[in-house]
């Protein structure tokens, strides 16, 4: 069985790492280059870098910042934000990214998933899905959770799986930043539905939450931001704990 992955996420706004609760009220959380280096040294399995203003403000992800982060880490590196065409992917891979994460652009133009998978390989294409549990089910949102779409989480995840995405990064907007645990029921449904790995995002507050998302949510990887950025959970201690709980992680 593949080892479960622990993935710190850097949300970048104006060149700084920030972390909000429920997608608003952003507060600064440090220099992305320093944080990336620290996580790499601490044994994080991967790093995710999201330019959270890129899609909304039509800005291209800061290529030079990607280069600086990539130069300071030795773990797989996923970059997202404002990726709309193959040339964006090319630019970011050349800057040192290993994978790209697409979200709003995939919903607006689903063929982009097929194109990236075909041109660069499925392993490069991570489709991020921001969804919120509503009365009618899990609805997908665009532009950092600002715009509701007519797509539903499970249908959309299945579609991008079929189109050639290599992984799904699912953020529950109901759980994001609240620190009450991941959306394990929805994650477990995704795991059963899909043939590709699922990364859980939104809700980590303590080590037990990571254990539960692997055991109950059947997630392949767990992503978190604030608990790492503010030193509430240290990655070596988290991995030791998970190991003791019978979860297969890379120590």
Swiss-Prot record:
**Catalytic residues?**
11, 130
Q: In which pathway does it act?
A: Amino-acid biosynthesis; L-histidine biosynthesis; L-histidine from 5-phospho-alpha-D-ribose 1-diphosphate: step 5/9
* Predominant cellular place of this UniProt entry's protein: cytoplasm
User: What Enzyme Commission number(s) appear in the record?
Assistant: 4.3.2.10
Which UniProt keywords are present, listed alphabetically?
Amino-acid biosynthesis, Cytoplasm, Histidine biosynthesis, Lyase
Q: List the signal peptide residues.
A: none
- Asked if the Swiss-Prot or TrEMBL record annotates the protein with the keyword Cytoplasm, the reply is yes
Which Gene3D superfamilies has this protein been placed in?
A: Aldolase class I
GO CC terms in record: cytoplasm
User: What CDD domains has UniProt attached to this entry?
Assistant: HisF
The lineage's top-level taxon is Bacteria
Identify a single GO molecular function assigned to this protein.
Answer: lyase activity
Q: Of which family is this protein a member?
A: Belongs to the HisA/HisF family.
Oligomeric form and interacting partners: Heterodimer of HisH and HisF.
Its protein name is Imidazole glycerol phosphate synthase subunit HisF
Please report the organism this UniProt entry assigns to the protein. Answer: Phocaeicola vulgatus (strain ATCC 8482 / DSM 1447 / JCM 5826 / CCUG 4940 / NBRC 14291 / NCTC 11154) (Bacteroides vulgatus)
- Organismal lineage: Bacteria, Pseudomonadati, Bacteroidota, Bacteroidia, Bacteroidales
């Amino acid at each position: 069985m593949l080892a479960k992955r622990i993935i710190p996420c850097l949300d970048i706004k104006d060149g700084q790492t920030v972390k909000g609760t429920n997608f608003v009220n952003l507060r600064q959380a440090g220099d992305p280059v320093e944080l990336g280096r620290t996580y790499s040294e601490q044994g994080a399995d991967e790093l995710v870098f999201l330019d959270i203003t890129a899609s909304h403000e039509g800005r291209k992800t800061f290529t030079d910042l990607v280069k600086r982060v990539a130069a300071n880490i030795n773990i797989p590196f996923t970059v997202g934000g404002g990726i709309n065409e193959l040339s964006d992917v090319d630019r970011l891979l050349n800057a040192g990214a290993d994978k790209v994460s697409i979200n709003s652009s995939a919903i607006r133009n689903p063929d982009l998933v097929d194109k990236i998978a075909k041109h660069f390989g499925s392993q490069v294409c991570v489709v991020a899905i921001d969804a919120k549990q509503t009365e009618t089910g899990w609805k997908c949102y665009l532009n950092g959770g600002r715009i509701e779409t007519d797509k539903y989480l499970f249908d959309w995840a299945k579609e991008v799986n079929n189109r050639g995405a290599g992984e799904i990064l699912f953020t529950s907007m109901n759980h994001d930043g609240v620190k009450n645990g991941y959306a394990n029921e929805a994650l477990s449904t995704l795991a059963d539905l899909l043939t590709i790995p699922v990364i859980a995002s939104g809700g980590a507050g303590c080590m037990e939450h990571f254990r539960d998302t692997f055991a109950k949510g059947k997630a392949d990887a767990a992503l978190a931001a604030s608990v790492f950025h503010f030193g509430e959970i240290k990655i070596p201690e988290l991995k030791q704990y998970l190991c003791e709980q019978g979860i297969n992680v890379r120590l």
